[in-house]
A protein has these predicted regions:
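Preference for protein termini
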Residues: 1-129
Length: 129
């Protein structure tokens, strides 16, 4: 799942690079121009701007659900502020306190270092010119 989400965020960054430069997705009719130009998230001031490292979105919030058949689905790609990032941290902390036995025998990826990793990621991003 992690590899797929990384691939998805890379694709979203490639899309933003295109929309703010060559606009090939619009020219090829893949995305109707009115969808782009009327979007509240589109900023014409960014046209022609290449951000440091070519990365437009440093943080992404992917809303996922799992179907009854076990298949995972992405409901939404959120490239704005990851407002829900703290919810899993608090939920996992409560789960560890209430049912610590669940975490002993199951490989659950630890999420407590998320704030540090986010800070490290943002600090390693080149400053804007």
């Amino acid at each position: 799942m992690e590899a797929g989400l990384k691939q998805r965020v890379n694709a979203l960054n490639a899309y933003l690079r295109d929309i703010y430069s060559d606009k090939q997705a619009i020219k090829d009719g893949i995305v109707p121009e009115e969808y782009v130009y009327t979007s509240a998230g589109y900023f014409p001031q960014v046209n022609g701007v290449t951000p440091p490292g070519g990365v437009f979105a440093h943080i992404a919030g992917e809303d996922l659900v799992q179907g009854q058949d076990g298949q995972w689905w992405v409901l939404e790609d959120n490239l704005r502020i990851p407002s829900g990032a703290s919810y899993p941290l608090f939920a996992r902390d409560i789960e560890r306190r209430i049912t610590p036995s669940l975490f002993r025998n199951v490989r659950v990826r630890d999420n407590r270092d998320y704030p540090r990793l986010l800070r490290q990621s943002m600090d390693s991003s080149p400053p804007t010119a």
